[in-house]
Regions:
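Beta-sheet repeat architectures centered on beta-propellers
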Residues: 1-87, 123, 130, 140, ...
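Disordered, low-complexity "stalk" and linker segments at domain junctions of extracellular
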Residues: 2-34, 52-257, 262, 268-274, ...
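Surface-exposed loop/turn elements that mediate protein-protein interactions on large endomembrane-trafficking
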Residues: 54-57, 92-105, 257-274, 303-320, ...
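Short beta-strand motif characteristic of blades in beta-propeller domains
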Residues: 83-84, 244-254, 292-297, 344-347, ...
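A short beta-strand motif characteristic of beta-propeller blades
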Residues: 230-232, 270-277, 320-326, 370
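Internal metal/ion-chelating core segments
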Residues: 271-313
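Loop/turn segments within WD40 beta-propeller blades
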Residues: 288-289, 336-340
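Short secondary-structure subsegments characteristic of cysteine-rich extracellular domains
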Residues: 316-338
């Protein structure tokens, strides 16, 4: 007698005849989390994507799809903004409006390219001072950019009118609405100081509309505003990609070729060059987990500390994983994923998990050999993490691998199951729902009204060729049972409504058999025997599988 009292997933790298006792040769669309066979619910259509969509992002109940590879970063909640790279040739910030509508602006505030021209009546004397002017741009969010180069100096008496011209208007994509004008002012001294210290700053003269072509400055020095603070501000690199938010820090991050860039904390438009980090390899993917930044490259992976207390780049710790694990993905938006355990991405040997302490693990090595892995086109991988499962889709196969059984009280541990879905992209919502983009439709996984039909086929059950099973018993609420011989022929099939034993037809002698289940009902237990009365009286004195 062969008894199946628990059910596992497939292990492609292991020959059928050497599979562990609970493993399967086919486990397709089946739920194994509770130690028995159960059906997932069908997907639920929850939205329509743009034509030829390649990615999808959720923000609360709002979703956004794009026909190119676009990355989106959420930011501090009360800012009411989202940040994007890949939609245009430059990074963007979007203001969230009514009904999820987005108004896009180019991220950053540019430095003016023109130098102001100043004119007025020059004077000399104790009440006169030499001054020069600069100006900055201010955008719709009140963010200010770096100043222009200073104008030529002019010496005038305090309060004398100075005409200022030469303002230029930046590209409309920046959303600049105003100009700040600054002029130099020197602190007053009595003249009897032992050490002469002259403090000269640019102080605010006036904020004017962006459309202003000229301005007359006759403001007294005592009425000037605050000193300029944006001398070292820099807009993000034009080719920035993979924008992410380091949660809890107020810092955005993104990459170019082999450089990692950071914004100043709570200044998302200011990407000062002092924060730039250069790595020795080309960057492929990045992910964030809290204030940790994970970086995969075409060489070694890295973990970077992006904590809020870190100001200059020297303070950001960079840890290298001292094993070459090149990321081979071809640049899909979902070709890496952040999980509670770290970042997962695709290498030539399998899925790599890099933990926050810069340790790594090949999490698919127990299921896929390197040769098996290469066959499924891992360079085309799309990944998601959902309730303890890693969902992996390639151009060849889609599967789910459980990596966190403890949190979700799984009785059987990690299992690998193939899926019918062929998503172009995947994402998870803030409420933890898995969304698949397929056929320009957004599908919510495991949310439909009906159940999905599954197939599960056991390992080879060895009867030694000396006997043939004549009866079967399945504890189920309704499932189709099939028996497959050693020639891979389906020699018996029948719908079984309950656990009443059934008789099998004459099957002939084979060395082994595989028991298969198809349908939507649950299966707690199954047994193959050679005597009907043994199963009828539930005398399970055979080999437990």
């Amino acid at each position: 007698m062969a008894i199946l009292s628990s059910f596992g997933g497939i292990i492609p790298r292991v020959a059928w005849h050497t599979l562990p006792l609970t493993s399967a040769t086919v486990a397709h669309d089946v739920k194994l989390r509770n130690g028995k066979l159960e059906a997932w619910r069908e997907r639920l259509a929850v939205g329509t994507a743009t034509t030829d969509a390649k990615c999808v992002w959720y923000h609360g109940c709002c979703y956004y799809t794009f026909d190119k590879c676009v990355d989106m970063a959420e930011y501090v909640t009360d800012y009411g903004r989202l940040y994007f790279t890949g939609r245009e040739d430059y990074p963007e910030v979007a203001k969230i409006g009514d009904n999820c509508a987005l108004t896009y602006y180019r991220l950053g505030v540019p430095k003016p390219t023109s130098v102001l021209t100043v004119s007025g009546t020059s004077s000399t004397g104790r009440n006169c001072a030499s001054r020069s002017y600069v100006y900055t741009y201010v955008n719709v969010f009140g963010e200010e950019g770096a100043p222009s180069l200073p104008s030529e100096s002019i010496t005038v008496a305090d309060g004398t009118a100075v005409t200022i011209t030469g303002f230029t208007i930046p590209d409309a994509t920046y959303g600049v609405t105003a100009i700040n004008i600054y002029r130099t002012a020197t602190s007053w001294t009595e003249g009897n100081e032992k050490v002469q210290e002259t403090n000269t700053d640019y102080l605010l003269v006036e904020t004017i509309p962006i459309s202003t072509s000229s301005y007359i400055d006759n403001i007294l020095e005592k009425n000037l505003g605050e000193a300029i603070t944006t001398e070292y501000n820099r807009e993000p690199p034009e080719n920035l990609r993979e924008i992410r938010y380091l949660r809890g820090t107020g810092v955005l991050t993104g990459v170019t070729t082999n450089q990692v860039h950071f914004s100043k904390a709570y200044q998302p438009s200011n990407w000062s060059s002092e924060y730039d980090l250069t790595l020795p390899y080309n960057i492929v993917n990045i992910q964030t987990l809290g204030n940790k930044l994970f970086v995969s490259t075409d060489g070694y992976p890295y973990v970077i500390d992006g904590a809020q207390k870190c100001e200059p780049r020297q303070c950001r710790g960079v840890s290298e994983v001292f094993t070459p694990l090149p990321d081979i993905s071809c640049g899909h938006v979902n070709s890496s994923v952040a999980t509670p355990f770290g970042m997962i991405y695709s290498s030539k040997d399998g899925l790599v998990l890099v933990s926050p302490d810069a340790k790594f693990q090949l999490i698919t090595s127990a299921w896929f050999s390197t040769d098996d892995w290469i066959k499924i086109r891992p360079d085309t991988v799309r990944l998601a993490y959902w309730r303890g499962y890693v969902i992996c889709a390639t151009d060849v196969i889609t599967f789910m691998l459980e990596i966190d059984s403890g949190v979700y009280n799984d009785a059987t541990g990690a299992n690998l199951v193939t899926l019918s879905d062929e998503p172009v992209a995947l994402t998870t919502t803030q409420s933890g729902e898995l969304i698949m983009l397929e056929g320009n439709i957004l599908w919510q996984w495991n949310a439909g009204k009906s159940f999905r039909k599954y197939i599960w086929t056991s390992r080879e059950l060895n009867f030694g060729g000396e006997s043939t099973p004549t009866t079967a018993k399945v504890r189920t609420d309704g499932i189709t049972v099939s028996l497959i011989d050693s020639d891979n022929s389906h020699v018996f099939e029948r719908f079984v409504p309950d656990e009443t034993p059934i008789r099998l037809k004459r099957l002939g002698r084979h060395r082994n058999w595989r028991l298969s289940f198809t349908g939507t009902g649950s299966v707690d237990y199954a047994a193959l025997g050679i005597r009907y009365d043994t199963l009828e009286r539930n005398k399970l004195n055979g080999t437990k599988i």
